[in-house]
């Protein structure tokens, strides 16, 4: 590469490594809460104004109410018997990341596709920022082409 290199790891370069255990506890508690299908009290893991930023198909949600009304509740309505299986979780100071899959039954409308009753896998990656014991930011990538292919829709 010629010339100046772009700044790398701008968001995580000054992370406080002493926060790793706290970050891990928050993320593991939140994942357990999602696996238990908690909605009413899941806010204990999120800061008041947290941002949830997903790829196209998910969009960006500001705050818990918007996240729940425009992602968590519709997603749970579309997929029942859902369990999150992280293949790996990584923790570094105030940062955490995971990739894995959710296994679920397609039991409601999702992206315009009527319920099929099929058990599918939903592959994802998550990146979280945790400050003062709460998730402040969550970047999400869901493999929608893979999900839709399992539901009989070829987007390509």
Each predicted region: which residue ranges?
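A short, structured loop/turn motif at beta-sheet edges
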Residues: 89-97, 129-136
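Short, low-complexity N-terminal intrinsically disordered segments enriched in polar/charged residues
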Residues: 2-48, 154-156
